[in-house]
Amino acid sequence: MPSEHPFSDGISTLNPKETMNDTAQITASYGRRYIVRTPDGTTYEASTRKKRVDFACGDRVRISPVNAEQVVIEDFLPRQSLLYRQDAWKTKLIAANVTQLLIVTAAVPSPSVRLLQRALLAAEAAGIRAVIVLNKADLPETALWREKLKFYETLGYPVIETRALENAGSLRPALQGHSNILLGQSGMGKSTLTNALLGSQTARTGDISAALDSGKHTTTHARLYDLNGETQLIDSPGLQEFGLHHLQAADLPRYFPDFRHLVGQCRFHNCTHRAEPGCAFKAAAETRAASPERLAFLQGITDELPG
């Protein structure tokens, strides 16, 4: 294989017709460029037909050989889940077939409650278990943010504290047996946590990662790693916004653990949970049985959604 090939390290040079299964999993995605891995562990650079971009890291796909180093992705196999975001202009696929979303947050730099709440909604809508990771927990600035996160624990979302290099291992029991994805703002330490969890595997995947990242130290694309035979981990690029235009307004209350038990209890079936008489949501907020701020958040998201 020519040494200048950007994916030369770790990519098979064997005859694909002799070694390739017709299925694979996407282990890295970068625009329209992908890395896929077949069941026997062989990796290939992959492209798509007709410039398709509806594939995500974690997808299990059907492939066809192009040459000894490259394959074409023909289609994806049925998905267990799909995590994505959508605003008024575009849809961005994040990961497929994940069973657990770990939202990595920290007191420094300034954490976004908006992003946290939106990511939790997206996980609920996709049927994905959500966990909050409080990273950099040893920083003195953490105390106030830790207190704010206690509210989400009351909603049933576990909060796990980490200090990246020192005790990333505290995450391992929560990761075990899941297809996991780390998601959060830039600077929260997702990639540092990933490297600490991977250990020596980082060196084995480093060359391909460097080729995809063009030498940058920040994650610019999603990458999937095997922690063991039962556990996978996807590191994803940092986010600042999480559009939810793919959700339906009528379904939103079911994605709120603090409001879903009130669904169907309003006097009017088409209640907007604002000024209508007999609104169970408004009554709960007025009596502090539910958070008024959370009701305002529900109303705000409803206003954003088309139709």
Curated annotation (Swiss-Prot):
Positions bound to GTP? 135-138, 184-192
Per UniProt, subcellular location reads as: Cytoplasm
Q: What is its main location?
A: cytoplasm
Cofactor binding mode, per the note?
Answer: Binds 1 zinc ion per subunit.
* Keyword Glycoprotein part of the UniProt annotation: no
Which InterPro entries is this protein grouped with?
G_CP_dom, P-loop_NTPase, Ribosome_biogen_GTPase_RsgA, RsgA_GTPase_dom
Cofactors demanded by this protein: Zn(2+)
Could you give a GO molecular-function term held by this entry?
GTPase activity
Query: Where is Zn(2+) bound in this sequence?
Result: 266, 271, 273, 279
Q: Which UniProt keywords apply?
A: Cytoplasm, GTP-binding, Hydrolase, Metal-binding, Nucleotide-binding, Ribosome biogenesis, RNA-binding, rRNA-binding, Zinc
Its GO CC terms are: cytoplasm
UniProt GO BP? ribosomal small subunit biogenesis
Q: What job does this protein perform? A: One of several proteins that assist in the late maturation steps of the functional core of the 30S ribosomal subunit. Helps release RbfA from mature subunits. May play a role in the assembly of ribosomal proteins into the subunit. Circularly permuted GTPase that catalyzes slow GTP hydrolysis, GTPase activity is stimulated by the 30S ribosomal subunit.
Matching PANTHER family: SMALL RIBOSOMAL SUBUNIT BIOGENESIS GTPASE RSGA, SMALL RIBOSOMAL SUBUNIT BIOGENESIS GTPASE RSGA 1, MITOCHONDRIAL-RELATED
Quaternary structure? Monomer. Associates with 30S ribosomal subunit, binds 16S rRNA.
Q: Matching HAMAP family, A to Z? A: GTPase_RsgA
Question: Which family does the record claim for this protein?
Answer: Belongs to the TRAFAC class YlqF/YawG GTPase family. RsgA subfamily.
* Name assigned to this protein: Small ribosomal subunit biogenesis GTPase RsgA
